[in-house]
Swiss-Prot record:
Lumenal side: 31-325
Protein name: Beta-1,3-galactosyltransferase 6
Reactions catalysed, as given in the entry: 3-O-(beta-D-galactosyl-(1->4)-beta-D-xylosyl)-L-seryl-[protein] + UDP-alpha-D-galactose = 3-O-(beta-D-galactosyl-(1->3)-beta-D-galactosyl-(1->4)-beta-D-xylosyl)-L-seryl-[protein] + UDP + H(+)
Native species: Mus musculus
Protein localization: Golgi apparatus, Golgi stack membrane
GO cellular component terms, semicolon-separated: Golgi apparatus; Golgi cisterna membrane; Golgi medial cisterna
Pathway(s) where this gene product acts: Glycan metabolism; chondroitin sulfate biosynthesis; Glycan metabolism; heparan sulfate biosynthesis
Listed cofactors: Mn(2+)
Listed InterPro entries: Glyco_trans_31
Pfam families assigned: Galactosyl_T (PF01762)
Spans through the membrane: 12-30
Protein purpose: Beta-1,3-galactosyltransferase that transfers galactose from UDP-galactose to substrates with a terminal beta-linked galactose residue. Has a preference for galactose-beta-1,4-xylose that is found in the linker region of glycosaminoglycans, such as heparan sulfate and chondroitin sulfate. Has no activity towards substrates with terminal glucosamine or galactosamine residues.
GO biological process, one term: glycosaminoglycan biosynthetic process
Glycosylation site positions: 127
Length: 325
């Protein structure tokens, strides 16, 4: 009876405590629901985005001008084909940003809705490999796609021509695809921005598609996501990707139409991706495509190209010669 009398005497405090406990529990449950997948009315998981070709553009927090140029040229709605042809995001690391930079990105996201913000990652060259792996992991978890084009925000891509090429492929040529402009004779850099102090495999990098733009099939992206905890990251994301896929049974397709080296080889109407383009270069190419149906006002070759010789050792793979785009 004493217990009941004490409980009655403190009934108000106990009641308030119970309400607080219930409120805390409800808030916790609401938070859990918001952090997980939201089920649909049928109890199934929320539908994933769908696209034949996903496009992930690596961009820096302050590169607004470049993103604007890409949005108004090769990633403009009229360049994306039909429904569910192309899905695109600009990937930006936001770790360590100040409040003003974060606010600017939030406003840009509110306006365009095409940013993939990575809060756990500080956007810097030394983190580029981790960034690309995070981009691909996010994509595999949230989008149903067949292929992904990874590009830089200073690259210009012909999505129409890329879509035509991919759709024309037989099923066997769509699986485990690693498509771009390959290098097999890249010497390990001992210093400078591209220094790889931890590289111990050999005196050359393993064959890799240059990072200005390349295409991967969805099955390889899925493999990378599942393996990510075991993958060693080097400074260069393209070198890292080539190394990660070296022991895998993939279809490596070297294509000179990917002008994706550290500087452009010029302008050729056959090019699918052209790297190292200024916003002005992109606008000029877009206008040429709209009014002339071709990429270049005048074709020009600034550097020789090559066809990769897969029958030769990697160090002898890539002999530049006339007549190759």
């Amino acid at each position: 009876m004493k217990v009941f009398r004490r409980a009655w005497r403190h009934r108000v405090a106990l009641g308030l405590g119970g309400l607080a406990f219930c409120g805390t529990t409800l808030l916790y449950l609401a938070r859990c629901a918001s952090e997980g997948e939201t089920p649909s009315a049928s109890g199934a998981a929320r539908p994933r985005a769908k696209a034949f070709l996903a496009v992930l553009v690596a961009s820096a927090p302050r590169a607004v001008e470049r993103r604007t140029a890409v949005r108004s040229t090769w990633l403009a709605p009229e360049r994306r084909g039909g429904p569910e042809d192309v899905w695109a995001r600009f990937a930006v690391g936001t770790g360590g940003l100040g409040s003003e930079e974060r606010r600017a990105l939030e406003l840009e996201q509110a306006q365009h809705g095409d940013l993939l913000l990575l809060p756990a990652l500080r956007d810097a060259y030394e983190n580029l490999t981790a960034k690309v792996l995070a981009m691909l992991t996010w994509l595999d978890e949230r989008v149903d796609f067949e292929f992904v084009l990874k590009a830089d925000d200073d690259s210009f891509a012909r999505l129409d021509a890329i879509l035509v090429d991919l759709r024309a492929r037989e099923p066997a040529r769509r699986r485990r695809l690693y498509w771009g402009f390959f290098s097999g004779r890249g010497r390990v850099k001992p210093g400078g921005r591209w220094r790889e102090a931890a590289w111990q495999l050999c005196d050359y990098y393993l064959p890799y598609a240059l990072g200005g733009g390349y295409v991967l099939s969805a099955d390889l992206v899925h493999y990378l996501r599942l393996s990510r905890e075991y993958l060693r990251a080097w400074h260069s994301e393209d070198v890292s990707l080539g190394t990660w896929l070296a022991p895998v049974d993939v279809q490596r397709e070297h294509d000179p139409r990917f002008d994706t080296e550290y500087k452009s080889r010029g302008c050729n109407n056959q090019y699918l991706v052209t790297h190292k383009q200024s916003p002005e270069d992109m606008l000029e190419k877009q206008q040429m495509l709209l009014h002339e149906g071709r990429l270049c006002k005048h074709e020009v070759q600034l550097r020789l190209s090559y066809v990769y010789d897969w029958s030769a050792p990697p160090s002898q793979c890539c002999q530049r010669k006339e007549g190759v785009p």
